Amino acid sequence: MRFATAQLAALAYYILSTEATFPLLGDIFNCIPHNTPPVCTDLGLYHDSSISLGGSKNKREAEIANKDGTIEKRTFGSAGVNAGFNAAFVVSNAKKLSDGSYGIDCNFKSDSSVQLNSAFGKKVKQLSITGTGYSDISLLGNVANPFEWSASLKVKAEIVKGKCCLPSGFRIVTDFESNCPEFDAIKQFFGSSQIIYKVNAVSNAIGTFDASALFNAQVKAFPAKRELDEFEELSNDGVTHSKRTLGLLLGLLKKVTGGCDTLQQFCWDCQCDTPSPSTTTVSTSSAPSTSPESSAPSTTTVTTSSSPVTSPESSVPETTTVTTSSVPETTPESSAPETTTVTTSSVPSTTPESSAPETTPESSAPESSVPESSAPETTPESSAPESSVPESSAPETETETTPTAHLTTTTAQTTTVITVTSCSNNACSKTEVTTGVVVVTSEDTIYTTFCPLTETTPVPSSVDSTSVTSAPETTPESTAPESSAPESSAPESSAPVTETPTGPVSTVTEQSKTIVTITSCSNNACSESKVTTGVVVVTSEDTVYTTFCPLTETTPATESASESSAPATESVPATESAPVAPESSAPGTETAPATESAPATESSPVAPGTETTPATPGAESTPVTPVAPESSAPAVESSPVAPGVETTPVAPVAPSTTAKTSALVSTTEGTIPTTLESVPAIQPSANSSYTIASVSSFEGAGNNMRLTYGAAIIGLAAFLI
């Protein structure tokens, strides 16, 4: 309980110390890196007590004073005479950082800092702290007033008179911009564009101080105005600005300067002043029991120590704070309960060859170790109880201690002698304490939880690759637009490789390791690799769905036969095939626009010498019979037409006429397909003669009337629809 309370207090102290700063001027600029937290704060502060508050000023004025006690006017403008503004500087806090450096809180204030900031603040080019032992620190822009600020910075201390002090190269540098009245005034008054404050060396002794009181005393000790005559007597050679403006600035500088450019030296304690760790003692002993072989008391010592205790003959490795107890084991001779050993130690702890408070002729004293023994509190006759401490070596045992030593029994006594080792300030002392018999029984229970693997499915060593599947009835010259199968394409395309596990899934005995042969197939090539893994069962299944629309009809390309009388046939039903005359070629069909702005289209190609048109129910077909004496077969053509339309036979053309095609189109809006009739022209021979049948005017007039009625009916139907 006491140890836990001390830990909580230390943790709270550490958390609060990380944010502890002690500025004297309000806000503080913290430039200590965050990766170096403080180890301890509030180190004792010291300063050079031999220097009075006005000592530096008085010394400087004494150097520039003449015999009659007045200050020479010629000293103004001389470099080094007026080296800086009158300023107060105090270190208000020091802390040790984790990397061995120190963090200090500095406070700086010039005389009439508000007026100086108003007159020169905007003309300050650089404000920095140098000589800290680390990188320079820029304060300009990080502090509101360059003439009054507080900053927390990291320094590498110098040892002076046993204390850590500011480095001898510590500087506060203020640099001003050029080509302005302010610069001319600064240069005229100080002889330079820079004002540098440096640290004094410790002359005699250092003493403690109160930071706030010392800072206020320095501020009140600023010197009074210097007694001067007219400022016009100052040398203003090369100054291009008005003398009035320059005079005002020089008046302010005269008010706040005393010829001092040095800072007091400040020191602090180098080490943290922390109390020594306290020691606690926990004692346990075994319960009373009888044994025919031993009568020595058994004792257990628990030591909390912070420094090593060495012995001439043995040593044990470093132990950590562990509280353990052994499981009771009973020998045939007795049934004494187990002994608990509690060890809280952070340094090696060894025991001398023998430290027995009580001895008997037949057993060794408790807490003694023999060079041949490896268990704590054991004797050649196994008289002292033993305890096992997992993962830790108990103090006052030898290096060979094993955590699985068997327990032995001894006779319990009414008193127990405990040796307590107390360490403080790098010194340790031992004391013996006699206590009563206290039996502490403890037991450790170890729970091991695991999830057994009940089934192992081996990964198959081979896979089947499915080849490319194309849609059936697909011609090599064209791909049907109706096909939507993702894998039906030209022969050059290939379907993705599908891996299908082969072999049944079986249950095998659980193994600790599994060597898996992985066969990877890609781009018609497979490779095998072996991988050693733990027993991991992964069951996965890939389902590949292939959807395609088969092509039910294939139309082969038909080549035209030259110098041949063989008829060309087509597989379209309800179509008659007509023989082709020698040396005859079918002209291309011409599509005439349908009546009532209904276009007549034909989308299927026609083979040479053959006309393919769908047959319309109720159509009347009239063959056209040309007279060709030398032709091998007359060209007979089937021309289905729409219902109610009559086709007139057409006589062959004269020998001198060219090939023409006449088409008769009948269109019914929305329901009747377009019917085309093609009339081929036959090349006549030299001796051929033709007979032209006469057509009566009555017959032609009848045909014209029918066509007129049909056109009128079709037009009326189209208008009504």
Curated annotation (Swiss-Prot):
The keyword Ubl conjugation does not apply. Induction: Expression is negatively regulated by the TUP1 transcriptional repressor. Also regulated by EFG1, RFG1 and RIM101. Induced during hyphal growth, during mating process, under alkaline conditions, and by farnesol. Repressed by fluconazole. Pfam families: Flo11, Flocculin_t3. Residues 500-510 have a biased composition (Polar residues). Residues 55-278 form the Flo11 domain. PROSITE patterns: FLO11. Residues 697-721 form a propeptide. Residues 454-499, 555-575, 584-663 have a biased composition (Low complexity). Keywords: Cell wall, Glycoprotein, GPI-anchor, Lipoprotein, Membrane, Secreted, Signal. Residues 278-410, 453-510, 555-666 are annotated as: Disordered. InterPro entries: Flo11, Flocculin_t3_rpt. A lipid is attached at S696 (GPI-anchor amidated serine). It is found in: Secreted, Cell wall; Membrane. Its main location: secreted. Residues 1-20 form the signal peptide. The keyword Cell inner membrane does not apply. The GPI-anchor is attached to the protein in the endoplasmic reticulum and serves to target the protein to the cell surface. There, the glucosamine-inositol phospholipid moiety is cleaved off and the GPI-modified mannoprotein is covalently attached via its lipidless GPI glycan remnant to the 1,6-beta-glucan of the outer cell wall layer. Disruption phenotype: Leads to hypersensitivity to calcofluor white (CFW). GO terms for biological process: fungal-type cell wall organization. GO terms for cellular component: cell surface; extracellular region; fungal-type cell wall; hyphal cell wall; side of membrane. GPI-anchored cell wall protein required for mating efficiency, biofilm formation, and virulence. Involved in normal disseminated infection, but not in intestinal colonization. Belongs to the HWP1 family. This is Cell wall protein RBT1. It comes from Candida albicans (strain SC5314 / ATCC MYA-2876).
